[in-house]
Amino acid sequence: MIAANFLLNLFLYPILIKLFRRRRIGQYIRKEGPDLHGYKEGTPTMGGILFVLTGFLFGMISKTTTMVLLGMFLFFLIGFLDDFLSVVRKDSTGLKTYQKALLQTLSALIMLLLIRPETNVDFFGFTIEMGKWYYLFALLVIVGSSNAMNLTDGLDGLAGWIYVSGSIPYWFFLKERGVSEDILLILGAGVLAFLVFNSKPAKIFMGDTGSITLGGVLGTVSVLTKTEFYLVLFFLIPVIETLSVILQVGSFKIFKRRIFRMSPLHHHFELIGWSEEKIVAVFTVFNLISSLVVLEIFGVIA
Protein backbone atom coordinates (compact mmCIF):
# COMPACT_ATOMS: atom_id res chain seq x y z
CA MET A 1 0.00 0.00 0.00
CA ILE A 2 2.87 2.34 0.84
CA ALA A 3 4.67 1.42 -2.37
CA ALA A 4 1.43 1.83 -4.33
CA ASN A 5 0.98 5.35 -2.97
CA PHE A 6 4.55 6.24 -3.90
CA LEU A 7 4.13 4.97 -7.46
CA LEU A 8 0.73 6.63 -7.87
CA ASN A 9 2.13 10.01 -6.81
CA LEU A 10 5.20 9.52 -8.98
CA PHE A 11 2.94 8.94 -11.97
CA LEU A 12 0.48 11.77 -11.24
CA TYR A 13 2.83 14.62 -10.29
CA PRO A 14 4.06 15.33 -13.87
CA ILE A 15 0.41 15.55 -14.94
CA LEU A 16 -0.43 17.85 -12.04
CA ILE A 17 2.54 20.11 -12.79
CA LYS A 18 1.49 20.51 -16.42
CA LEU A 19 -2.10 21.20 -15.37
CA PHE A 20 -1.09 23.83 -12.81
CA ARG A 21 1.24 25.54 -15.30
CA ARG A 22 -1.55 25.66 -17.85
CA ARG A 23 -3.93 27.10 -15.24
CA ARG A 24 -1.22 29.45 -13.94
CA ILE A 25 -1.55 28.16 -10.40
CA GLY A 26 1.83 29.52 -9.38
CA GLN A 27 3.70 30.72 -6.32
CA TYR A 28 3.86 34.43 -5.50
CA ILE A 29 7.00 35.34 -3.56
CA ARG A 30 6.51 37.55 -0.50
CA LYS A 31 8.30 40.87 -0.81
CA GLU A 32 9.99 40.59 2.60
CA GLY A 33 11.57 37.25 1.64
CA PRO A 34 15.16 36.80 0.43
CA ASP A 35 15.99 38.41 -2.93
CA LEU A 36 17.49 35.06 -3.90
CA HIS A 37 13.98 33.63 -4.29
CA GLY A 38 12.77 35.96 -7.04
CA TYR A 39 13.31 33.38 -9.78
CA LYS A 40 10.82 31.02 -8.08
CA GLU A 41 7.89 33.29 -8.85
CA GLY A 42 5.32 31.42 -10.92
CA THR A 43 6.45 27.91 -9.95
CA PRO A 44 3.34 25.71 -9.57
CA THR A 45 2.17 25.55 -5.96
CA MET A 46 -0.48 23.68 -3.94
CA GLY A 47 1.38 20.47 -4.80
CA GLY A 48 0.49 19.05 -1.41
CA ILE A 49 -3.04 18.49 -2.67
CA LEU A 50 -1.93 15.27 -4.39
CA PHE A 51 -0.02 13.52 -1.59
CA VAL A 52 -2.69 14.58 0.92
CA LEU A 53 -5.63 13.27 -1.11
CA THR A 54 -3.91 10.00 -2.03
CA GLY A 55 -2.78 9.73 1.58
CA PHE A 56 -6.39 10.16 2.69
CA LEU A 57 -7.53 7.48 0.23
CA PHE A 58 -4.92 4.91 1.26
CA GLY A 59 -5.40 5.92 4.88
CA MET A 60 -9.06 4.91 4.69
CA ILE A 61 -8.13 1.62 3.03
CA SER A 62 -5.55 0.90 5.75
CA LYS A 63 -8.14 1.63 8.46
CA THR A 64 -6.22 4.60 9.82
CA THR A 65 -7.71 6.05 13.01
CA THR A 66 -10.79 8.07 12.07
CA MET A 67 -9.68 10.99 14.23
CA VAL A 68 -6.36 11.24 12.37
CA LEU A 69 -8.16 11.31 9.03
CA LEU A 70 -10.56 13.96 10.32
CA GLY A 71 -7.68 16.10 11.56
CA MET A 72 -5.94 15.60 8.24
CA PHE A 73 -9.06 16.76 6.38
CA LEU A 74 -9.63 19.84 8.56
CA PHE A 75 -6.06 21.09 8.28
CA PHE A 76 -6.04 20.31 4.57
CA LEU A 77 -9.03 22.63 4.15
CA ILE A 78 -7.18 25.44 5.95
CA GLY A 79 -4.05 25.04 3.85
CA PHE A 80 -6.03 24.75 0.63
CA LEU A 81 -8.03 27.90 1.42
CA ASP A 82 -4.83 29.80 2.19
CA ASP A 83 -3.20 28.77 -1.10
CA PHE A 84 -6.39 29.28 -3.09
CA LEU A 85 -6.78 32.87 -1.88
CA SER A 86 -3.14 33.58 -2.71
CA VAL A 87 -3.57 32.29 -6.26
CA VAL A 88 -6.84 34.16 -6.80
CA ARG A 89 -5.45 37.44 -5.44
CA LYS A 90 -2.21 36.93 -7.37
CA ASP A 91 0.03 37.80 -4.43
CA SER A 92 1.68 35.97 -1.53
CA THR A 93 -1.13 36.91 0.86
CA GLY A 94 -3.67 34.18 1.48
CA LEU A 95 -5.36 34.00 4.84
CA LYS A 96 -4.31 36.68 7.30
CA THR A 97 -2.26 35.43 10.24
CA TYR A 98 -5.10 35.77 12.74
CA GLN A 99 -7.55 34.08 10.36
CA LYS A 100 -5.25 31.12 9.89
CA ALA A 101 -4.61 30.86 13.65
CA LEU A 102 -8.34 31.01 14.37
CA LEU A 103 -9.16 28.26 11.88
CA GLN A 104 -6.33 26.08 13.18
CA THR A 105 -7.51 26.59 16.76
CA LEU A 106 -11.11 25.76 15.87
CA SER A 107 -9.99 22.62 14.03
CA ALA A 108 -7.86 21.51 16.98
CA LEU A 109 -10.75 22.17 19.39
CA ILE A 110 -13.07 20.04 17.27
CA MET A 111 -10.48 17.26 17.34
CA LEU A 112 -10.07 17.43 21.12
CA LEU A 113 -13.81 17.46 21.76
CA LEU A 114 -14.19 14.32 19.65
CA ILE A 115 -11.05 12.54 20.88
CA ARG A 116 -11.67 13.30 24.57
CA PRO A 117 -8.08 12.32 25.44
CA GLU A 118 -6.89 11.37 28.90
CA THR A 119 -5.52 14.42 30.69
CA ASN A 120 -2.13 12.98 31.60
CA VAL A 121 1.10 13.30 29.63
CA ASP A 122 4.09 11.01 29.32
CA PHE A 123 7.12 13.17 30.10
CA PHE A 124 9.84 10.76 29.00
CA GLY A 125 8.71 7.96 31.29
CA PHE A 126 7.13 10.08 34.00
CA THR A 127 3.34 10.38 33.99
CA ILE A 128 2.09 13.86 34.82
CA GLU A 129 -1.59 14.55 35.42
CA MET A 130 -2.51 17.95 33.99
CA GLY A 131 -6.25 17.96 34.55
CA LYS A 132 -8.17 20.48 32.48
CA TRP A 133 -4.92 22.26 31.60
CA TYR A 134 -4.15 19.34 29.31
CA TYR A 135 -6.65 20.61 26.74
CA LEU A 136 -4.77 23.89 26.41
CA PHE A 137 -1.51 21.94 26.15
CA ALA A 138 -2.91 19.61 23.47
CA LEU A 139 -4.32 22.59 21.58
CA LEU A 140 -0.86 24.17 21.50
CA VAL A 141 0.68 20.89 20.35
CA ILE A 142 -1.66 20.45 17.38
CA VAL A 143 -1.68 24.09 16.27
CA GLY A 144 2.04 24.45 16.98
CA SER A 145 2.90 21.36 14.93
CA SER A 146 0.88 22.65 12.01
CA ASN A 147 2.59 26.05 12.11
CA ALA A 148 6.05 24.58 12.66
CA MET A 149 5.89 22.53 9.46
CA ASN A 150 4.48 25.55 7.65
CA LEU A 151 7.45 27.69 8.76
CA THR A 152 9.88 24.96 7.72
CA ASP A 153 8.53 24.96 4.17
CA GLY A 154 10.74 27.75 2.83
CA LEU A 155 13.36 26.05 0.67
CA ASP A 156 13.19 23.52 -2.15
CA GLY A 157 12.80 20.10 -0.55
CA LEU A 158 13.23 21.22 3.06
CA ALA A 159 9.80 20.50 4.58
CA GLY A 160 9.49 17.26 2.63
CA TRP A 161 12.82 15.85 3.73
CA ILE A 162 12.27 16.94 7.33
CA TYR A 163 8.91 15.15 7.36
CA VAL A 164 10.43 11.97 5.93
CA SER A 165 13.47 12.05 8.25
CA GLY A 166 11.24 12.37 11.30
CA SER A 167 8.07 10.44 10.44
CA ILE A 168 9.72 7.11 9.63
CA PRO A 169 11.66 6.90 12.93
CA TYR A 170 8.53 8.19 14.71
CA TRP A 171 6.52 5.32 13.19
CA PHE A 172 9.06 2.77 14.47
CA PHE A 173 8.92 4.40 17.91
CA LEU A 174 5.12 4.15 18.01
CA LYS A 175 5.24 0.57 16.72
CA GLU A 176 7.53 -0.38 19.60
CA ARG A 177 4.92 1.05 21.98
CA GLY A 178 2.22 -1.10 20.41
CA VAL A 179 0.65 1.66 18.32
CA SER A 180 0.26 1.43 14.55
CA GLU A 181 -0.20 4.75 12.74
CA ASP A 182 0.51 3.74 9.16
CA ILE A 183 -0.72 7.11 7.90
CA LEU A 184 2.75 8.43 8.79
CA LEU A 185 4.35 6.08 6.26
CA ILE A 186 1.55 6.43 3.72
CA LEU A 187 1.98 10.20 3.70
CA GLY A 188 5.75 9.73 3.72
CA ALA A 189 5.54 7.68 0.51
CA GLY A 190 3.58 10.45 -1.19
CA VAL A 191 6.00 13.07 0.08
CA LEU A 192 8.97 11.07 -1.24
CA ALA A 193 7.40 11.01 -4.70
CA PHE A 194 6.70 14.74 -4.37
CA LEU A 195 10.37 15.36 -3.51
CA VAL A 196 11.41 14.00 -6.91
CA PHE A 197 9.83 17.16 -8.33
CA ASN A 198 10.36 19.49 -5.36
CA SER A 199 14.12 19.17 -4.86
CA LYS A 200 16.07 22.11 -6.27
CA PRO A 201 15.26 23.41 -8.77
CA ALA A 202 11.69 22.76 -7.68
CA LYS A 203 9.12 22.12 -10.39
CA ILE A 204 6.32 22.40 -7.83
CA PHE A 205 5.84 23.52 -4.20
CA MET A 206 3.65 21.77 -1.61
CA GLY A 207 2.21 25.09 -0.43
CA ASP A 208 0.27 25.47 2.80
CA THR A 209 -2.00 22.76 1.43
CA GLY A 210 0.80 20.31 2.18
CA SER A 211 2.79 21.79 5.06
CA ILE A 212 -0.15 22.74 7.31
CA THR A 213 -1.69 19.30 6.76
CA LEU A 214 1.51 17.41 7.55
CA GLY A 215 1.99 19.34 10.77
CA GLY A 216 -1.65 18.91 11.75
CA VAL A 217 -1.42 15.15 11.27
CA LEU A 218 1.73 14.92 13.38
CA GLY A 219 0.19 16.92 16.20
CA THR A 220 -3.01 14.86 16.13
CA VAL A 221 -1.10 11.56 16.16
CA SER A 222 1.01 12.70 19.11
CA VAL A 223 -2.09 13.60 21.15
CA LEU A 224 -3.83 10.32 20.30
CA THR A 225 -0.75 8.27 21.23
CA LYS A 226 0.29 10.36 24.26
CA THR A 227 3.70 11.08 22.72
CA GLU A 228 3.51 14.87 22.61
CA PHE A 229 6.95 15.45 24.16
CA TYR A 230 8.58 12.74 22.04
CA LEU A 231 7.28 14.40 18.88
CA VAL A 232 9.52 17.38 19.62
CA LEU A 233 12.61 15.14 19.50
CA PHE A 234 11.64 13.56 16.19
CA PHE A 235 11.05 16.97 14.64
CA LEU A 236 13.68 19.18 16.23
CA ILE A 237 14.23 21.23 13.08
CA PRO A 238 10.63 22.53 12.87
CA VAL A 239 10.82 23.31 16.60
CA ILE A 240 14.07 25.25 16.11
CA GLU A 241 12.64 27.05 13.08
CA THR A 242 9.64 28.13 15.16
CA LEU A 243 11.80 29.25 18.08
CA SER A 244 13.94 31.33 15.71
CA VAL A 245 10.83 33.25 14.61
CA ILE A 246 9.65 33.77 18.20
CA LEU A 247 13.10 34.97 19.30
CA GLN A 248 13.48 37.24 16.27
CA VAL A 249 10.10 38.91 16.77
CA GLY A 250 10.53 39.18 20.54
CA SER A 251 14.03 40.63 20.29
CA PHE A 252 13.00 43.23 17.74
CA LYS A 253 9.91 44.32 19.68
CA ILE A 254 11.73 44.56 23.03
CA PHE A 255 15.28 45.56 22.09
CA LYS A 256 14.79 46.84 18.52
CA ARG A 257 17.51 44.41 17.43
CA ARG A 258 17.43 41.29 15.31
CA ILE A 259 19.16 38.09 16.40
CA PHE A 260 19.22 36.56 12.92
CA ARG A 261 19.62 38.16 9.52
CA MET A 262 16.19 36.76 8.73
CA SER A 263 13.84 34.20 10.20
CA PRO A 264 12.90 31.37 10.03
CA LEU A 265 16.42 30.08 10.60
CA HIS A 266 16.91 28.59 7.13
CA HIS A 267 16.75 32.10 5.64
CA HIS A 268 19.50 33.25 8.01
CA PHE A 269 21.82 30.59 6.61
CA GLU A 270 20.85 31.58 3.08
CA LEU A 271 21.87 35.17 3.75
CA ILE A 272 25.26 34.19 5.18
CA GLY A 273 26.07 32.34 1.97
CA TRP A 274 24.89 28.76 2.36
CA SER A 275 23.29 27.21 -0.72
CA GLU A 276 19.76 25.81 -0.50
CA GLU A 277 21.12 22.32 -1.11
CA LYS A 278 23.57 22.62 1.79
CA ILE A 279 20.92 23.93 4.20
CA VAL A 280 18.47 21.18 3.26
CA ALA A 281 21.15 18.50 3.59
CA VAL A 282 22.47 19.74 6.96
CA PHE A 283 19.00 20.27 8.44
CA THR A 284 17.80 16.86 7.23
CA VAL A 285 20.84 15.01 8.58
CA PHE A 286 20.52 16.84 11.91
CA ASN A 287 16.84 15.92 12.18
CA LEU A 288 17.51 12.32 11.19
CA ILE A 289 20.35 11.95 13.71
CA SER A 290 18.22 13.38 16.52
CA SER A 291 15.45 10.93 15.59
CA LEU A 292 17.81 7.96 15.56
CA VAL A 293 19.27 9.01 18.91
CA VAL A 294 15.76 8.91 20.37
CA LEU A 295 15.26 5.39 19.01
CA GLU A 296 18.60 4.36 20.51
CA ILE A 297 17.88 5.89 23.93
CA PHE A 298 14.49 4.21 24.21
CA GLY A 299 15.74 0.85 22.99
CA VAL A 300 13.95 0.72 19.65
CA ILE A 301 17.22 0.04 17.86
CA ALA A 302 20.14 -1.86 19.35
UniProtKB/Swiss-Prot annotation:
**Keyword Cytoplasm tagged:** no
* NCBIfam families per the UniProt record, alphabetical: mraY
Q: What is its EC number?
A: 2.7.8.13
Enzyme class per UniProt: transferase
Q: What does the sequence similarity comment in the record state about its family? A: Belongs to the glycosyltransferase 4 family. MraY subfamily.
- Localization annotation: Cell inner membrane
Q: How does it sit in the membrane?
A: Multi-pass membrane protein
Q: Which organism is it from?
A: Thermotoga petrophila (strain ATCC BAA-488 / DSM 13995 / JCM 10881 / RKU-1)
Q: GO MF terms on file?
A: metal ion binding; phospho-N-acetylmuramoyl-pentapeptide-transferase activity; UDP-N-acetylmuramoyl-L-alanyl-D-glutamyl-meso-2,6-diaminopimelyl-D-alanyl-D-alanine:undecaprenyl-phosphate transferase activity
This protein's record includes keyword Electron transport: no
| InterPro entries for the chain | Glycosyl_transferase_4, PNAcMuramoyl-5peptid_Trfase, PNAcMuramoyl-5peptid_Trfase_CS
**Any one GO cellular component localisation term in the record:** plasma membrane
| PROSITE patterns assigned to the protein according to its UniProt record, in alphabetical order | MRAY_1, MRAY_2
What's this chain's function? Answer: Catalyzes the initial step of the lipid cycle reactions in the biosynthesis of the cell wall peptidoglycan: transfers peptidoglycan precursor phospho-MurNAc-pentapeptide from UDP-MurNAc-pentapeptide onto the lipid carrier undecaprenyl phosphate, yielding undecaprenyl-pyrophosphoryl-MurNAc-pentapeptide, known as lipid I.
Q: Which reaction does it catalyse?
A: UDP-N-acetyl-alpha-D-muramoyl-L-alanyl-gamma-D-glutamyl-meso-2,6-diaminopimeloyl-D-alanyl-D-alanine + di-trans,octa-cis-undecaprenyl phosphate = di-trans,octa-cis-undecaprenyl diphospho-N-acetyl-alpha-D-muramoyl-L-alanyl-D-glutamyl-meso-2,6-diaminopimeloyl-D-alanyl-D-alanine + UMP
Protein name per Swiss-Prot or TrEMBL:
Phospho-N-acetylmuramoyl-pentapeptide-transferase
| Single biological process term from Gene Ontology | cell wall organization
Q: What keywords are assigned to this protein?
A: Cell cycle, Cell division, Cell inner membrane, Cell membrane, Cell shape, Cell wall biogenesis/degradation, Magnesium, Membrane, Metal-binding, Peptidoglycan synthesis, Transferase, Transmembrane, Transmembrane helix
> Its principal location?
membrane
Q: In which pathway does it act?
A: Cell wall biogenesis; peptidoglycan biosynthesis
